[in-house]
Amino acid sequence: MNENKYIHFERLWRGLVIGTPYLWLVLFFLVPIGFVFKISLADPIIGQPPFTPLWEWTDSARISILTTFDNYRFLFMEELYWISYLNSVKVAAISTLICLLVGYPMAYGITRCSGNIKSFLLLLIVLPFWTSFLLRVYAWMGMLSTHGVINTLLLNSGLIEQPLKLLYTDLAVYVGIVYTYLPFMILPLYANLERRDLVLTEAAADLGSRPWRAFLDITLPLSTPGIIAGCLLVFIPALGEFVIPTLLGGLDSLMIGRTLFDEFFQNRDWPLASAVATLLLLILIIPIMIFQKYREQET
């Protein structure tokens, strides 16, 4: 009898431990997304909350559904939102490519270093996370301004005669995003390259393969999972970035994060803003599905 109670308690405890993460995902991920989608099917009104209910009781004690897809139709018809989405995808894709081109050699070089130097370089990579994200962005504003460090050095060296307009440009946005998310590219690449079997490259060298050929045929294909993981970790947050385009790009930098903020807090059009957020979420799911498909093919 006691043994049966113990087995029952063990199963209950195991189910509780396993189910806790799923409960967390449901409460803090699926439920909020459900509320956002629900609001996107409503109409904006002046009131609190600033949207219409999705159903109401009629005089005949029946539920009347009041959903509408006008917000989604408006997104597809209005050019402003398409420009925001396309510009966000462009900025995120180019920033991800730059992070990959810069981060891969850095990650590869770190794996070739000795123990103490390797630890020191990894510390330098994660060191920016110890400071506030906003402080780092404000620091770049000071460096890129007309009288900032970069323009001052260029003027004193005689390379330019007039200060360059670096702040509030697309270049400043790319610099800020690459600087912020570069560690998210380097760390998964380093973890992948650190686990590679050096015997394979040594065997290729013994067979007469040149180093660059061994890299293209062995190291690069084996590091594909790290490349994909790093690209996802950079592309997904960069796509919805709001702070960097606003502070470094100014008002002319139109990205979907800024559009979403304006609809929520300035226009107070919560249904339209929820539709913008829902469509953005669908766009973010696409690279994740591609990565999952790749993992299934690999296994």
Where are the model-predicted features located?
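Membrane-interfacial helix termini and adjacent extracytoplasmic/periplasmic loops
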Residues: W55, S60, V137-V178, W212, ...
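Short membrane-interfacial helix/loop motifs at transmembrane-helix boundaries
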Residues: L30-E79, H147, G250-L251, T299
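Interhelical loop and adjacent transmembrane-helix boundary motif
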Residues: H8-R14, W57-D59, Y72-L75, E79, ...
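Transmembrane alpha-helix signature in integral membrane proteins
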Residues: E78-R112
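Cytoplasmic-entry segments and transmembrane alpha-helices of multi-pass inner-membrane transporters
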Residues: L16-I18, P105-A139, M143, T201-E202, ...
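C-terminal transmembrane helix and the adjacent membrane-cytosol boundary/short C-terminal tail
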Residues: K5-I7, Y190-A205, L272-T299
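N-terminal signal-anchor/first transmembrane alpha helix
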Residues: M1-I39, G109, S119, L123
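Transmembrane alpha-helices
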Residues: T20, L123, L127, Y179, ...
